[in-house]
């Protein structure tokens, strides 16, 4: 009887390892779609908010359009550079600005590549470079 258990154990172990490898492969292939849930807006979309704002655009080194919003207040104490989460777009995240403008801070929020009006393909390196473009904007 002990001999029969060994082949069954090997089959179960083989199936578990195979299932694990398939799961890892699927997660690797689809990780971008599982992590980032962008909302894409028309390039002619018009934002509307209660607070005054300026729409800002930058062109990255690779030609991608980077879209952002700058919410301004009179005599700001400083500026908040806000990077939103892994979903949505500026239409949704622009609402966060009022949480900071009520305390007299300017707010700049950007859309990542492939979100909202921003174009281009995301990579970790490009996301850092894009963040630097907006950082340079708020520190000038």
Locate each region found by the language model.
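Residues at structural and domain junctions
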Residues: 8, 12, 21, 117-120, ...
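Membrane-embedded segments
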Residues: 61-138
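An N-terminal hydrophobic leader/cap segment in hydrolases
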Residues: 12-59
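Generic, low-specificity signal for short hydrophobic/alpha-helical stretches with a mild N-terminal bias
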Residues: 8, 16-17, 40, 50, ...
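N-terminal Lys/Arg-rich, disordered targeting/topogenic segments
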Residues: 1-8
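A short alpha-helix capping/helix-coil boundary motif
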Residues: 9-11, 24, 33-34, 74-77, ...
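Residue-identity detector for threonine
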Residues: 25-28, 39, 48, 101, ...
